[in-house]
């Protein structure tokens, strides 16, 4: 399963590293996701949730 936020849909983004000579190499920026248990349809479920969603109170841990 991809490390994508279950609540906000945030997923890793891609781009380039740029050196002083402006060479470019591919890289990715990951999302700060944590595996937590939350209530989904009244039942506990383990899902990946972003730290931003946890801090802002979008989900309640079980």
Swiss-Prot record:
Which InterPro entries does the record associate with it? Bacterial_rp_bL28, Ribosomal_bL28, Ribosomal_bL28/bL31-like_sf, Ribosomal_bL28_bact-type, Ribosomal_bL28_sf
Gene Ontology annotations of biological process type: translation
Region (Disordered) residue ranges read 1-26
Which superkingdom heads the taxonomic lineage of this protein's source? Bacteria
Q: Which GO terms describe its cellular component?
A: ribonucleoprotein complex; ribosome
The record's keywords, sorted A to Z, are: Ribonucleoprotein, Ribosomal protein
Keyword Ribonucleoprotein in the entry? The reply is yes
Compositionally biased, Polar residues: which spans?
11-20
Gene Ontology molecular function: any one: structural constituent of ribosome
Q: Which Pfam families does the record match to this protein?
A: Ribosomal_L28 (PF00830)
UniProt-listed HAMAP family: Ribosomal_bL28
The Swiss-Prot or TrEMBL record describes its family as follows: Belongs to the bacterial ribosomal protein bL28 family.
Q: What is this protein called?
A: Large ribosomal subunit protein bL28
